[in-house]
Amino acid sequence: MTERTLVLIKPDGVQRQLVGEIIGRIERKGLTLVALELRHVSQDLAAQHYAEHEGKPFFASLLEFITSGPVVAAIVEGPRAIAAFRQLAGGTDPVEKAIPGTIRGDFGLETQFNLVHGSDSVESAKREIALWFPDA
């Protein structure tokens, strides 16, 4: 089944010049980039994107991080795109949970600075794509 998912290359991935490597891995997996944009994230967009974490102790630092530099936002499409990208990304904790061969396992060091975001469900993908690409 063809799905769409939102992929973000977070400020640490952009700053470390890993955009080409990450995009290449997405394409080599067989997924298609439907839309791609380099942008600075507003506080409002960040708060909407991470609304499920509002009230948690790490919420403010999450917003500070995602707005700290440019982000690459992409709509990625393909068979089981949500699960396929999450497998490619690796576990949220790059050191303890992400295995070598994944984006986070190969390049990540800290949970907060874990390079990429991918939608975790069809519902999340629809909501996140509408936030980041309202005309898509």
UniProtKB/Swiss-Prot annotation:
Gene coding for it: ndk
Keyword entries, A-Z: ATP-binding, Cytoplasm, Kinase, Magnesium, Metal-binding, Nucleotide metabolism, Nucleotide-binding, Phosphoprotein, Transferase
This protein's name: Nucleoside diphosphate kinase
Source organism of this protein record: Mycobacterium avium (strain 104)
EC number: 2.7.4.6
Chain positions recorded as ATP binding sites: 10, 58, 86, 92, 104, 114
InterPro entries in UniProt: NDK-like_dom, NDK-like_dom_sf, Nucleoside_diP_kinase, Nucleoside_diP_kinase_AS
Source taxonomy: Bacteria, Bacillati, Actinomycetota, Actinomycetes, Mycobacteriales
MF terms in GO: ATP binding; metal ion binding; nucleoside diphosphate kinase activity
Subunit description: Homotetramer.
Subcellular location: Cytoplasm
Record-linked Gene3D superfamilies: Nucleoside diphosphate kinase-like domain (3.30.70.141)
